[in-house]
A protein has these predicted regions:
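Sec-dependent signal peptide recognition
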Residues: 2-10
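C-terminal motif of bacterial Sec signal peptides marking the signal peptidase cleavage site
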Residues: 13-16
């Protein structure tokens, strides 16, 4: 009888370990103003640019509180990116196009990736680099190409 109970306990344990977990259960609930469609886009661009999803959410929450049409002075959209910064990352449209959530995420998360690299994986530091700019830090670390700011390094020691 003891052997049967032991076998049953092991079988239950193995079955529980083998069950597929629901990835949606790992996602935090939607933030105020966030929609499922917006969450999908955020995750898509975070994964594409290899930036932690929580970092992208942190920047969006800080910059626009999940409002794609947010404007503050010269800054546009979800991640409050400057049109000049977006152009530096490859954007070729009109500034108002940055009020489209997907367009904003495409260029702003690309820029955030550089802040993430310069921060050496420190999320709070990455937010600060994103907000104040990281060109000179990337230049001094020979990371202009890696961060996407330039197609070649400008410092002679980096070439």
């Amino acid at each position: 009888m003891t052997r049967l109970l032991s076998i049953l306990a092991v079988a239950i344990f193995v079955a529980a370990c083998g069950s597929k977990s629901d990835d949606a259960g790992n996602e935090p609930p939607l933030y105020p103003n966030e929609t499922p469609e917006l969450r999908f886009l955020i995750n898509q661009y975070a994964d594409y640019y290899e930036v932690p999803r929580p970092l992208v959410h942190k920047v969006i929450q800080r910059e626009s509180d999940y409002r794609p049409k947010a404007r503050n002075g010269p800054y546009y959209g979800l991640m409050q990116i400057l049109p000049a910064t977006a152009r530096n990352m490859g954007f070729r449209g009109k500034p108002n196009e940055l009020l489209d959530a997907e367009t904003n995420l495409k260029w702003a998360v690309k820029y955030l990736r550089g802040a993430w690299l310069v921060s050496d994986g420190d999320m709070d530091e990455a937010v600060q680099w994103y907000a104040r700019g990281y060109y000179y830090e990337a230049r001094d670390r020979c990371q202009l190409v890696e961060t996407g700011l330039r197609t070649r390094e400008v410092a002679k020691r980096c070439r």
